[in-house]
Amino acid sequence: MTPTAPTLLRPTDPADVSRLLAGARAVAGGTDLLVQRRAGAEAPTLVDLTGLAGARPAVTSDDAAGELTISAVHPLTDIANGLTDGAGVFPALTAAICQFASTTIRNRATIGGNLVTGSPAADTVPALLAAGAAIDIVTPDGGLRTVDLAEFLLGPRRVDLAAGEWVTSVRVPQPPVEGGFRKIGGRRAQAISFLNLAWQWHREPDGRLTGVRLAMGSVAPTVVRLRTAAAVLEAQLPTQDVVDAAVAAIDADISPIDDLRASAHYRRRCAAGLLREALLPPSGTARADQYVTPTTREKNQ
């Protein structure tokens, strides 16, 4: 049966959103909306948050606080442009957005939507988790609460967002200039990730890596930090032996499953390969801090 068309409200004043959300559901880009409605998720009234985007920039940088504030309601294209145009430097997130779905989807999809769907395969979440992001949430009474992204993610399709609440922005400490993102999917675009990896670190003058932070998607109920592997790399030169040790440490932090997209065995193999390529890019490829176009792999190897 065809779902009944919902009522759509599009406020332009943040003060109106909490009132309108009573008995309604918030949407932004709506790129996952039709999929969910076909699966039986009904909402008689939708509150479109994209009308709030005109009131503020997509990305702002607070040099004094040393952090970036990223709008949850601007399209991903605007976020990438804001980062590229000098509002801040966040190479892992920029690379993730460039590999996200397709141009058409990026012109609609938002950071907020990618977060609240709670998908362990979400492409923007690893970069945000690796950066230590905090989520700013507007409560039903118009107040504001902040929760660490690691605590916001509760499980597959489950996040710490109560009825009547909505995500307004994401704040991250200013990331280092060296970072990146890689994903493996069934094709180069319009594909859910079999696996993805985001990383960031400082490279000291002697080549040692410090402030190493790694996060991976599609290997656990939520996107997870690879803390054990990061600890192996911390303050080390990324020699072959060190990289081998870091790759071997990945298993301590992941728990992949078999599903329709890939097997657990395949995901473990890919996890090792993605980290190895981030640290020791094959000759003739982009450096680890540059964008990397995903490649198609045999998912059942």
What are the functions of these language-model segments?
Residues 1-301:
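C-terminal structural segment of proteins
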